[in-house]
C-alpha cells in the first residue's frame, strides 16, 4: 500500500454522505413507535382543538354582561346549566345567564368568555343557582379557540423526526393507530485481532478483552440501527476476507474494528482491494482516528474503524452515525453542536483537528466542557463519563480554561444539519480547515 494522504474531516464526511441513502419504511402499532423515526410528515388532518373549548373549570358567560362589574358592584349571573368534557349544551344562554363548564368542554354557542371558578362566588336562592363576578371580562377570555394549537394541513413533525412522548401524543390525536416509521438499517459488525479475548475469558499475557464490540453495539442501538454481529476473527487474511465477503450480503452497512493501520497484520486495505471495493479515504487529518478507512462496494458502505477504543468511538460518531440517521430519513443526521466554556486548560498544539472526550455540564445556564480523564486513543476509561466531544480545529495552538470551544453532543436525538462550515480560527477571520 502506498503512502496515505490525509484528507480533512469535512471532506471525509462529505465523501461518506455521498453514499448515504434513505432506507425503507414499515408500519408499527402506536404503542411500539416511541424511539423510532417518522417515515412520513405528520400532517394535521383537522384543527386542534376542533372546537372552541374551556381550558379551566368555571362558568361560560357573555362577556358584555360583565362590562360594569367591579369589586364594589359585582354582577350576578343565574346558572342555567352544566356542561362536562365530551358533552354539549344546546340551549340558549341569555343575558346575565351562565353555564357551569368543566375543563375541555365545548363553549356554548351564545357564550364568548369563561370565568375561572376561583374568581366567582356561588350561592343558591329560592332553589335557583347563582354566581357573581367582581371584574369585567373581554370576548375570548379563557377560551382555547378552534385551531389555535394546530390548523388542518399543518406539518406538525417532519419525516425523519425522532418519535418522543410529545410526538406520540400527536400521533394519537390524529388517529394513527399504526405509525409509518423508518425501518432500522441492519449494521453488520465484525471484530479483528488475534489479541482479542471474549468477555468471559480470563486475561492472558498480551491479550485484551473485546471491549470495542460492545461499545459499538451500544452506539449502533443508541442511534437507531439494528446490529448483526458476526464475531471476532484472528489476524489471518483469508479468514477475515471470507468473513467480510459473507457479511456484506446480509447487511445494509458493515463495520469492522481493527486491521486498518499500517502493520504487517492489518489486512483490511488488502481485503477491500480483493473485494473490488472503492476506497473513499484511508487517512483523515484528525486525532484520534486518523487511520479510519471507508470504502464502498456497489453503493454499500464498509467502515474500517480503528482498534483503539477512543479512535473507534470517534470514528463511529463522525462517519457511521450520520449514515444510519440518513437511512432513517433524518435531515439532521450529524451530531448537534453547541458552544461551551472550557473547564480545564488544553494547551497541547493541534496540528490536526482534535476530538477530546468530555463531560458537559450546565451551571446557571452556561455549558461547561471538562475533558474526560486520560486522553489517548487507546483509553477506555475516559469514554465512560463522556457525553460530548470538544472540537479543537487543526492549526490551533491550544486553549486555556474558560475559553469558548465547540462541543458535539453525544446523548442527543435532535442532531444537526451539515455543521463543518461553522468553524473559524480563534480571533482571526480565516476559516479553519477541518
What are these regions (language model features)?
Residues 2-4, 9, 60-229, 373, ...:
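Short, glycine/charged-enriched hinge/interface segments at domain edges or termini
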Amino acid at each position: 500500500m502506498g503512502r496515505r494522504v490525509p484528507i480533512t474531516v469535512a471532506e471525509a464526511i462529505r465523501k461518506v454522505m455521498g453514499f448515504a441513502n434513505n432506507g425503507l419504511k414499515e408500519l408499527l402499532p402506536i404503542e411500539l413507535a416511541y424511539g423510532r423515526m417518522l417515515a412520513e410528515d405528520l400532517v394535521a388532518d383537522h384543527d386542534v382543538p376542533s372546537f372552541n373549548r374551556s381550558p379551566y373549570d368555571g362558568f361560560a358567560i357573555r362577556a358584555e354582561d360583565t362590562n360594569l362589574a367591579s369589586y364594589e358592584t359585582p354582577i350576578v349571573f343565574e346558572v342555567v346549566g352544566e356542561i362536562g368534557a365530551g358533552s354539549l349544551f344546546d340551549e340558549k344562554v341569555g343575558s346575565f345567564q351562565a353555564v357551569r363548564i368543566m375543563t375541555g368542554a365545548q363553549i356554548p354557542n351564545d357564550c364568548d368568555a369563561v370565568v375561572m371558578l376561583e374568581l366567582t362566588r356561588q350561592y343558591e336562592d329560592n332553589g335557583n343557582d347563582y354566581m357573581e363576578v367582581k371584574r369585567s371580562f373581554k370576548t375570548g377570555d379563557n377560551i382555547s379557540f378552534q385551531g389555535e394549537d394546530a390548523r388542518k394541513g399543518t406539518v406538525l413533525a417532519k419525516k425523519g423526526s425522532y418519535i418522543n412522548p410529545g410526538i406520540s401524543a400527536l400521533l394519537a390525536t390524529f388517529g394513527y393507530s399504526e405509525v409509518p416509521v423508518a425501518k432500522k438499517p441492519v449494521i453488520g459488525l465484525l471484530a479483528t485481532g488475534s489479541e482479542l479475548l471474549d468477555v468471559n475469558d480470563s486475561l492472558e499475557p498480551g491479550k485484551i478483552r473485546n471491549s470495542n464490540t460492545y461499545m459499538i453495539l451500544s452506539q449502533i442501538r443508541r442511534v437507531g440501527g439494528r446490529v448483526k454481529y458476526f464475531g471476532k476473527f484472528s489476524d489471518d487474511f483469508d479468514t477475515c476476507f471470507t468473513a467480510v465477503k459473507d457479511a456484506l450480503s446480509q447487511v445494509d452497512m458493515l463495520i469492522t474494528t481493527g486491521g486498518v493501520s499500517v502493520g504487517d497484520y492489518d489486512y483490511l486495505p488488502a481485503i477491500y482491494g480483493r473485494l473490488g471495493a472503492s476506497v473513499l479515504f484511508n487517512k483523515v487529518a484528525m486525532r484520534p482516528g486518523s487511520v479510519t478507512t471507508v470504502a464502498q462496494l456497489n453503493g454499500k458502505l464498509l467502515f474500517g474503524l480503528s482498534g483503539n477504543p477512543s479512535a473507534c468511538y470517534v470514528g463511529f460518531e463522525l462517519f457511521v452515525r450520520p449514515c444510519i440517521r440518513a437511512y432513517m430519513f433524518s435531515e439532521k443526521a450529524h451530531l448537534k453542536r453547541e458552544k461551551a466554556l472550557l473547564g480545564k486548560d488544553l494547551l497541547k498544539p493541534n496540528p490536526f483537528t482534535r476530538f477530546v472526550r468530555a463531560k458537559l455540564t450546565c451551571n446557571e445556564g452556561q455549558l461547561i466542557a471538562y475533558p474526560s480523564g486520560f486522553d489517548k486513543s487507546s483509553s477506555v476509561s475516559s469514554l465512560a463519563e463522556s457525553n460530548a466531544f470538544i472540537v479543537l480545529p487543526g492549526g490551533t495552538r491550544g486553549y486555556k480554561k474558560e475559553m469558548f470551544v465547540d462541543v458535539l453532543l453525544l446523548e442527543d436525538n435532535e442532531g444537526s444539519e451539515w455543521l463543518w462550515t461553522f468553524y473559524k480560527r480563534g480571533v482571526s477571520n480565516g476559516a479553519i480547515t477541518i
